[in-house]
């Protein structure tokens, strides 16, 4: 078992908190010391109470799903003898309302573009199988109920 931590910090910067007129900007600090400016998505909380330049939880969720899938995929490619030179994913999440009318990210679409080199290059079928295994072994995917699909990259 391992434990993973993040420190989330928010401070009131205006006197209008009780009127709902307050910034939702905050920071995420990770165990390696990296601090990331965060904010709700402007599609959820409009400016000036959000900051579109900051990472929002919805983007971070999509990035976590994509990153975990990629890391498992790279491990599997190596184990199967496929040399990966680059892996770029244009992942996207879709926010909808569930049956109770509550917003959630109902789907994440991964769209990886993977470049290989060497004598052994995977077939389309090999790639599909590696993506299937990566999804099965990704602990983030195993922790969520969101539908995750993989589309062909460009």
Q: Model segments located where?
A:
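Extended beta-strand/beta-hairpin segments
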Residues: 1-63, 74-154
């Amino acid at each position: 078992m391992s434990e993973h931590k993040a420190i989330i910090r928010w401070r009131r910067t205006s006197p209008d908190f009780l009127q709902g007129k307050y910034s939702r900007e905050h920071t995420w600090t990770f165990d390696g010391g990296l601090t990331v400016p965060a904010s709700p998505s402007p599609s959820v909380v409009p400016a000036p109470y959000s900051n579109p330049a900051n990472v929002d939880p919805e983007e971070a969720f999509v990035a976590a799903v994509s990153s975990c899938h990629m890391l498992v995929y790279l491990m599997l490619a190596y184990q199967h003898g496929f040399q990966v030179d680059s892996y770029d994913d244009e992942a996207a999440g879709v926010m909808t309302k569930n049956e109770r009318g509550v917003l959630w990210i109902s789907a994440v679409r991964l769209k990886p573009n993977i470049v290989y080199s060497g004598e052994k290059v995977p077939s389309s079928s090999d790639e599909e199988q590696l993506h299937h295994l990566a999804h099965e072994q990704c602990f983030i995917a195993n922790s969520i109920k969101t539908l995750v699909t993989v589309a062909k990259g460009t």
